[in-house]
Amino acid sequence: MRSELIIENTGLTGIIPYMYFRYYQAPVASTDLRVEPIVKHHPDFEKFIHGKMYDSLIFQQAFWKEMAMLFDGPKIIDLCDPDWLKYEFDFVELGHHVHAITCSSAELRDLVQRYIPNKIVEHVPDRFDFSLFPKPHGLHHGKAKKAVWFGYTHNAHETLPQLAPRIKEYGLELLIIANEPYSQEDEILALNPSFVKYEHDSCRQLISESDILLNPRSNRAYFRYKSNNKSVIAWKLGVPVAVTGDDIARLMDPDERNREIEKYAFVEKEYDIAKSAQQYRDIIRRIKDL
């Protein structure tokens, strides 16, 4: 018979972040998006403290099988990437030791549901603390001049080159906000893009000052399951999103860019972090009712 951790009904949910098992403190997007704003604004959630009693646990990209086996309260694995496609571990086995799995995109949810059909699997989008966002762009005027991309540099290497012909054709100034400067010898580097090291506040401010946010996709399977958080950030800041070269061509027109402002109200309603906290509460309640 396995040992079990004794659970007290504290009403408190501990969130175990990805960084719990890492020995460096570099910013991690999943923690910034899916842990920090929830524990900041919702006192029934907190970052996991070893030895503290919790009513329920959320493993945010933290694949801690031993704890999942021992802890007897409601348990959720929260996923923002299909890491088992890249790394060697048995995700299905781990999934059998929790009650529910939450995913940052609908595509990832559908994939996980096929792997583990007998568990609660829910889509919990990346959401935000909008009080931290700067003033949005406002109305767009004239032809677009500034395009911006942000994220991890290796993803820029993977996705940005497909947009290089249109960036060059329209003479757009390209700003890359990332962990490291763009270094791949290709058409993007030939455009001599500006570089700013990623920080939350400066990144969002710079996006709000741009005309177009670039968010190209990759054909690789891993990218298929990415969330739409970059687009949501841009829409909240009043900046339109170009996924393809044709989008860039269309968004050179200020009227086309201003049509994107209509998405602002939708983002305000659907992507506030309070909605994620409530989704987790509802899932925990469903688990307790099983």
What residues fall within each predicted segment?
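Extended catalytic core of nucleotide-activated donor transferases of GT-like folds
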Residues: K40-Q113
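Short, polar loop motifs at secondary-structure junctions
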Residues: Q61-K65, S105-D110, I177-D186, T244-D247
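A charged, aromatic-enriched C-terminal amphipathic alpha-helix characteristic of glycosyltransferases
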Residues: A29, S131, P254-L290
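Nucleotide-sugar-dependent
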Residues: H154-E158, H200-D201, Q205-L206, D211-K236, ...
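Conserved catalytic-core segment of nucleotide-activated headgroup transferases in glycan assembly
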Residues: G14-R34, D129-K135, L139-S208
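N-terminal pre-catalytic "stem/leader" segment of glycosyltransferase-like enzymes
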Residues: M1-F71
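Donor nucleotide-sugar binding/catalytic pocket of nucleotide-sugar-dependent glycosyltransferases
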Residues: H99-Q113, P117-K135
